[in-house]
Amino acid sequence: MALTRPSVRASARTLYFAYGSNMDVAAMAARCPGAAFVGTARVDGHAFRVNRNHHATILPAAGKVVHGVLWTITDADQALLDEYEGVAISLYRRHEVQAQHPDGRVEAAMTYMARNTEPTLTGGPYFDALLAAARRVGLPSDYVLELETWRSEGGWGGRNSGTLGR
């Protein structure tokens, strides 16, 4: 009878930084049933942007800050997120960031960055949900106001040549 070793990764969890629609607790519960909410966090040296596909992304930007939330996710959740974010079709890619908790602790976290970073203004249900989630989780009010600068009159379209972040 052969003995098998239990997998060390069986209970492994990944720290995930969400800055867009995945900040929403109900949405994450539906997308990733094993996800556990950790709390709010910030990532320095990155800026928020809405790309030409009308999706949120972040990109490296000296002196900028992105606020969001941290989750712990299982390997199965990460596979679901990879599918949701379009990793296989190159819409997004995984990226490691240094996330700072409100108490000052900094931890490495996985996030997703869109491959298309050409900016645009946006609107509609996706962006409304993103803003609502940002408010519900308690992101700083001045940051939420900055997020709102990505909204276009009437919903989709327009251009914003800058990047957001303090």
Residue spans of the language-model regions?
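Glycine-aromatic micro-motifs
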Residues: 2-166
